[in-house]
Amino acid sequence: MPETETKTGGLPYHEIRFPYDPRRRSVWKAICRYLQPWVASDEGLLELGAGYGEFSREICAARKWALEQNGALVQHWAVSVTPLIQSAMDPWPLADRSLGTVFASNFFEHFTLEQGEEILTQAARVLRPGGRLIVVQPNFRLEPRRYFDDYTHRTAYTDNGFRDFLRALGWEIAHAEPRFLPFTMKNRLPTAEWLVRTYLALPFRPRAGQFLIVAEKPGSLK
């Protein structure tokens, strides 16, 4: 969830940009099946900007936390997920080196570069050495014309740029896919789980506009 929730009595961000759609659950089932090999199922996991909680609902992990500043969205979450209702810029109430995975989807573009660095520093703190940061992100290189249609987007990232950003902060890149998912789910693309799984199995994914990066925390990163 962006850190720019309406303060003037207007509609909340999610109602404008991403109203709840139960069909997304089947999409996220397929996405989580694809991402599960990078997620340690016997360790803790944190989802950043969890929104409707689709990822944390479907992914397998020993214990799951989800950070979201809009507390009204928690009603959609699985009961197995521990909510952290706060800004990502505030200290996270999680112990050092206590998690195996931190996940963020469509998240970092809502922050300045400096804020993103602060968030990544917190992610490094809570991950154990060798723990993974998984990021799904709009790819400005593939979707420059629509990237700023979302009025809360602050920073433009390409797949190469975000990889270099992570490397500059000490992360090691374990896996990267410049063309991972379509730019948005706000269209008439099929949402059946088997179709999404078929799409993810394609060597070239048409209409892809988001990238996937999996980074690992080296032992030297605090």
Predicted feature descriptions by range:
Residues 1-97, 101-103, 117-120, 208-211, ...:
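Conserved N-terminal segment of class I S-adenosyl-L-methionine
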Residues 14-26, 85, 101-103, 111-128, ...:
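S-adenosyl-L-methionine-dependent methyltransferase catalytic module, highlighting the catalytic core
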Residues 107:
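Conserved sequence/active-site signature of Rossmann-fold short-chain dehydrogenase/reductase
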